[in-house]
Amino acid sequence: MKKYRIILAVLALAFSASCTDYLEVVPDNIATIDNAFTSRNTAEKFLFTCYSYMTSHASVYEQAFTIADEFMVPYPQATNTFYNDPYEIIGRGNQNVVDPSLNYWDGAKGGKAMFQALRDCNIFLEKVDNVPALDVSEKKRWIAEVKFLKAYYHYWLLRMYGPIPLIKVNLPVSASVEEVQVKRQPVDDCFDYIVSLLDEACADLPVKLPKLTTEMGRATQPIALSVKAKVLVEAASPLFNGNEDYLNFKDNDGIPYFNPTKDLAKWEKAATACKTAIAMCDSAGFKLYKYSPNSNDRINDELTVQMSIRNSVAENNFNLNKEVIWANTNNLSGHIQMLSTPTLDAKFTSNEGHRLVLAPPLNVAEMFYSSHGVPIEEDEEWVSMGKYTNRYRLKTATSEYKYNIKEGEQTATLNFDREVRFYANLSFDRNLWYGIGKYDMEDQWVIRARVGEPAGKRGMSLYSATGYFCKKLANYQNNLLEGNAAGYIIVDYPWPVIRLADLYLLYSETLNEAYGPSSEVYKWIDLVRERAGLEDVQNSWKKYAIPSRKSKPDTQDGLREIIQRERLIELANEGHRYWEIRRWKKAKEMWHNRPILGWDIEQSEAEPYYRVKTIFTPQFTTKNYFWPIKEYDLSVNPNLDQNPGW
């Protein structure tokens, strides 16, 4: 039997490893790799092994939800809690080189073993021809799927670490020391290789899944083309395109890993990829989700728009939700829904099936637009009437707000007169929550989040650290059970890795960067805004913005700012925020020494509760843009270079 060695630094000393080192993931305890390809069934299981390394996009343990400022969690925490692992260490500036958190290079501390994944993909591609009597079209599809996975796993590593070794083939155990001690490759070469794999994969992937219910999550042409678009956008973005911070970052032969010269053609190439992906998605029947009330609903137009936003993510019936291009079934949403749901009423306080701990900070709440569809700091009404200056002061809800805020109750001025996506994404003290057993706009749950109230702080670990909750992630058909310690019936849904709104906004971004403002740029932003109940970009700023900002959509810089904010709003709470701010090279500006804020949740009365408190002050320097490689890996492979600053 031929033996294999992955091209990975950490294995550089393991020259005498036996073949059994490589069989840990072979299905059904098959004795050898070759035996995994003696029948269609065992080969298919090996295909699914290649899929099994897919990162769990809905997991707060494996993702970037709390590394930056998308969510806060209680800190310090009680012992033996279930959400106090690596991401929290990174978010508070405690990443290290001895044992890095979220280590996808080695598959440790919350990270999956991506290089092992690439090795298994290579094994599959080399051995699949040995499967007897395998249908030719099925074999082509399987090969295309594995090439897609191979591209995606490379992309995941590239996005995290910058330059990486390219695992094009597995080396035999007889490989020399020099062959095994691989080098990181320039980032442009890495992007080119990933795109070439995606191009190869596309030809033999299906446009639609033949069996949606049993094949959900498997690669298709729309998925591959959408990933290609995102890869090329990443390559064109400031972190990788003309980044002078890494001017002196070179390999041992003096070859630079980054080209310090900005290349506008990368944006043009990304725009073409986005256009192609959108055309494919259109032909495959994808469209922006819009909620259709059912017979049990009693809701008005604004709540219907809210449900369109919420269900664009949380709808689990993909015959209804045609917006999700790629849904990851490797990790369903049940756990993150549990962490997002507040205690809706006093009768549920003994129910431990929900945890109310994922808390968007004040920084995120302020990001959403006013009801006019412009930033609150640029809204002429907010500025001229003093609403922005006094946004933390109390205001009493009148009947005008009765479907979003409990009439007669007080909350911060900040929570009034906001766009629908604000109320669809976030919940807060005295906010109304539609669904989870209540489907009448006149009888919604009232969130009461002050100390001593159902959704207020209790204990060391079960509370919102900021006073905000994440409404969008909780399916509205969930059901909390009274008097049942674990009684939370959750309607699970596959996590939406890519949805159509994401692609539309990417296309707008690439067009603006490549060519500047145009009707085509506005078109794709406005489609997303229209679904959110907002006027188009140009009219919104001309009608509602302060005089100095009315022409903002007319300039490339102004429109860039609008598109970036639109992406952060539309994709809020879905795990994109950290990666987006990073690729724009805005992380130092937005996070370094800028406090993460929330309400004073220790208070039982409205006045002191709505005092702004600092949760913590993150430190983000240039070195934090890329993950460190573990020191041990560098010691066994002298050809590897550590990322700058670590």
PLM regions with names:
Residues 19-68, 250, 414-416, 629, ...:
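Membrane-proximal, proline-rich intrinsically disordered regions
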Residues 158-159, 163-165, 231-243, 513-516:
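Short coil/turn linking the two alpha-helices of tandem helical-hairpin repeats
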Residues 164-184, 239-269:
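Short coil/linker segments at helix-helix boundaries
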Residues 18-19, 114-117, 193-195, 233, ...:
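Long, intrinsically disordered, low-complexity segments
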Residues 342-343, 352-353, 359-499:
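Flexible, polar/acidic helix-loop-strand segments at domain edges
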